[in-house]
């Protein structure tokens, strides 16, 4: 299996990512050159004997100059099994001391990056193990609403996101400067990257999550939940704020929501909607359930997984 991570190693730009790059170098993961350049910088390769990992240095966050980076991504990494961008999280109302992994998509346009629930779950579980091992008791591991920073300040082409044929996630530390500068938190992130293919063998039931807030605790908890030999697979989460701004109550909203479902590897087995979601978006969830022939549940059912029926989407 092959994973690739895009990491800004420019100390003069941004947060978290260059610290992660330096930690990867310190711990010996960047000792081998991959033998080619990406936008003028030497790509690094690490193998654990079973899988290989490519670490790609960039001069700024990948999403902020996708037109420049995409040709190299397609040339060198179109055959990868999983990919990720290392960055930081910030926001006026964002929680602090978070270690996050989230799927990519532009809800306004309905362009969704490919998502792999099993690999994303592996990253979240590895992040949690590293959080515990490094004594990061003040932090918590979470996912968040699906979004993409490739559209910013009113500029950007979200259709570029779907041109990279590899599942991708953002992997972040947030959300305040004290967290960005926390070497231990960045070390937890760095060590997580080489465990994306570590698998506990559980049966993963893929969900589409509809509604809720950006850091929706019910969906975040589900992403780390397992029972017996089963677990939830959480990737795309369609936050309420962007359902509204994207006008998902309209016919075009159904098209965009279908594009979201179709981007999830293996399809979905259930739809979970936040109970406080407006009626028109609950109707959307039910329509999607009928279209894909999967059950639709309110978010409270996530607490009783043994009572849920799962059915692979058609």
Where are the regions a protein language model picked out?
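Acidic, Ser/Thr-rich peripheral helices and adjacent loops at domain boundaries
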Residues: 223-241
């Amino acid at each position: 299996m092959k994973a690739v991570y895009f990491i800004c190693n420019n100390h003069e730009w941004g947060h978290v990512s260059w610290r992660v790059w330096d930690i990867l170098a310190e711990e010996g993961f960047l000792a081998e050159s991959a033998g080619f350049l990406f936008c003028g910088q030497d790509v690094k390769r690490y193998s654990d004997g079973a899988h290989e990992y490519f670490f790609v240095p960039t001069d700024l966050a990948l999403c902020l100059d996708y037109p420049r980076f995409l040709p190299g991504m397609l040339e060198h990494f179109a055959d990868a099994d999983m990919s990720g961008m290392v960055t930081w999280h910030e926001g006026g109302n964002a929680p602090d001391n978070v270690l996050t992994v989230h799927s990519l998509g532009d809800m306004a346009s309905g362009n969704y990056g490919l998502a792999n629930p099993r690999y994303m779950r592996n990253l979240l579980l590895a992040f949690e193990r590293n959080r515990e091992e490094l004594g990061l008791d003040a932090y918590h591991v979470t996912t968040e609403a699906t979004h993409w920073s490739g559209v910013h300040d009113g500029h950007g082409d979200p259709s570029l996101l779907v041109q990279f044929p590899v599942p991708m996630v953002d992997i972040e530390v947030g959300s305040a400067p004290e967290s960005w500068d926390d070497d231990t938190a960045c070390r937890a992130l760095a060590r997580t990257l080489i465990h994306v293919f570590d698998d506990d063998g559980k049966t993963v039931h893929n969900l589409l999550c509809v509604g809720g807030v950006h850091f929706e605790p019910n969906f975040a908890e589900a992403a780390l939940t397992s029972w017996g030999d089963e677990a939830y697979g959480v990737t795309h989460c369609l936050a309420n704020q962007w359902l509204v701004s994207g006008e998902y109550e309209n016919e075009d909203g159904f098209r965009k929501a279908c594009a979201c479902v179709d981007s999830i590897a293996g399809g979905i087995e259930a739809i979970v909607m936040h109970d406080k979601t407006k009626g028109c978006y609950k109707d959307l969830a039910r329509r999607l359930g009928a279209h894909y022939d999967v059950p639709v549940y309110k978010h409270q059912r996530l607490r009783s997984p043994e009572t849920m029926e799962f059915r692979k989407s058609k």
